[in-house]
């Protein structure tokens, strides 16, 4: 008898890998999904469901015409990045201190969650001499982003600010 354990992604129901084990009808299926799931978590996946482990121990059936197929479903982990925190660095653990933590993808290298816009007003007389001190104003903007740890894709949210207009200057 043969049992097939398929690991699929919720993103397009794509098969990530397949394991096959064989044995005799009535015997327990000697297999564990733990190591594969751990590896996928390191790559940035989350476990959605595990048909093989659900419901207890599995036994080879007596139907020789069909393989027993179990599906382990995984989703791509998307991690939010708060603009008020330091930006993540590529290839560093998402969860420091956890040995099996996935790592930030290279796409976070130039993550741009903060932006400033400045204006400078120069006060000068007609002859070009300084009339009074310059006025410099800066507006600060920030945005959240969501990083897909598997693909590296970054989804940026809208820019926000506490003040989006320069002060009136005379």
Q: Where do the language-model regions lie?
A:
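Conserved "repeat-terminator" motif of extracellular CCP/Sushi domains
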Residues: 1-8, 58-118, 122-124
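Detector for intrinsically disordered, low-structure N-terminal pre-sequences
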Residues: 7, 20, 47, 116, ...
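N-terminal compositionally biased, intrinsically disordered segments and leader/signal-like regions
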Residues: 11, 18-19, 23, 34-35, ...
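Short, ordered, surface-exposed loop/turn motifs in non-cytosolic proteins
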Residues: 11-24, 128-149
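Surface-exposed intrinsically disordered loops and tails
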Residues: 24-27, 59, 81-105, 144-168
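Solvent-exposed, conformationally flexible loop/turn segments
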Residues: 24-32, 63-67, 114, 142-144
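Surface-exposed interfaces of beta-sheet-rich extracellular modules
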Residues: 31-65, 84-85, 157-170
């Amino acid at each position: 008898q043969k049992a097939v354990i398929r690991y699929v992604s919720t993103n397009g129901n794509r098969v990530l890998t397949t394991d096959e084990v064989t044995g005799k009808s009535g015997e327990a299926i000697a297999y564990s999904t733990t190591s594969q799931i751990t590896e996928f978590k390191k790559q940035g996946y989350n476990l959605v469901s595990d048909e093989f482990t659900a419901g207890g121990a599995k036994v080879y059936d007596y139907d020789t015409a069909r393989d027993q197929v179990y599906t382990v479903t995984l989703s791509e982990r998307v991690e939010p990045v708060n603009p008020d925190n330091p930006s993540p660095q590529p290839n560093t653990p998402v969860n420091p201190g956890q040995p099996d933590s996935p790592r930030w993808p290279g796409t976070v290298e130039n993550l741009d969650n903060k932006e400033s816009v400045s204006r400078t007003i120069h006060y000068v007389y007609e002859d070009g001499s300084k009339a009074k001190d310059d006025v410099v104003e800066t507006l600060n903007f920030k945005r959240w982003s969501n990083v897909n740890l598997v693909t590296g894709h970054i989804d940026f949210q809208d820019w926000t600010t506490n003040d989006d207009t320069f002060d009136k200057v005379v």
